[in-house]
Amino acid sequence: PEMCIRDSYNPYTTMVGGDWYFAPVVRHTGAVYLNDRQLYEAETLEECIKGEVYAPSWEPEWSVYKWYTEQDKEKNQTVIYANFQGKNPTEEKVEINVRRNCFMPSKTGVNYITFSGFDVSKAATTWAPPAAYQDGMIGPHWSKGWIIEDCEVSNSKCCGISLGKYYDPENDHYFTRKHVKSPTQMERDAVCRGQYHGWTKENIGSHIIRRCHIHHCEQTGIVGRMGGVFSIIEDNHIHNINNMQQLGGAEISGIKMHAAIDVVMRRNHIHHCTMGIWCDWEAQGTRLTQNLLHDNCPPEGTPKAEGAMMSQDIFIEVGHGPTLIDNNIMLSPVSVR
């Protein structure tokens, strides 16, 4: 069927990729869904038709459901093919994503919003590394004092909820686009440049994410870089993050936070994610307490996908602390790294 995309963002021509993305850049931000489950993107029409198992998947039986897209340049149309494995798409629930975000202000500084009780699903979010604009299906976009509560958040192509970084045109995927310096230097620059863009306790952070059910997103359940300082993340159920293994890189976890300064993460239940909680850079005054983490590892015998990272319940990286990890139950093969 033909589809009309009314703005400049076409997820079926936009690729997932950027700084700290280690997998091949062959997946689109678009996706096809069958009965609320994302299909696996094929690189060719032949692969789509064959519908073979994708071995790195954590759910190989689901990986035979495929889709493929190409552009008809003569008609200026996006064409999508799908292999539903014999299911009739006119009788099943079949959807595609189009929106880049669902509830996220286009401007920064939109403070003190409460977002409560919504079911948010199926957005064409983009890869969200730390030295880039970090979008999600929901997010305050460099603001202060949001409450995101009692929501179901699922099936984002990349991130579910973003407490992340603003768009800085002079430091956005700069290594990928300009091929200078390094992604690590871009992160150092982001810390310094943030001071010129209002990164103070008076302006940014102090958010609350609570009692949300976050699942089946392919980069993170919750992501953040600098914008999540002084926040509380509590009583959330986060699971099945990055189980398709079609995306790979250094920004994948149930919760992935850079600069989780004075952030408390408590009483969260996190399982079946590539990683449970990853605090990267500046985990200063961070406390992880009373969380239940388990099965944050691939099924036994599953081959590693290209670009995939190691798995563990909690990972603290590039942080001089102090970071307090107390009263958690960690049952995965690797607990803390």
PLM features per residue range, with description:
Residues 111-124, 144-158, 170-190, 201-219, ...:
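Right-handed parallel beta-helix
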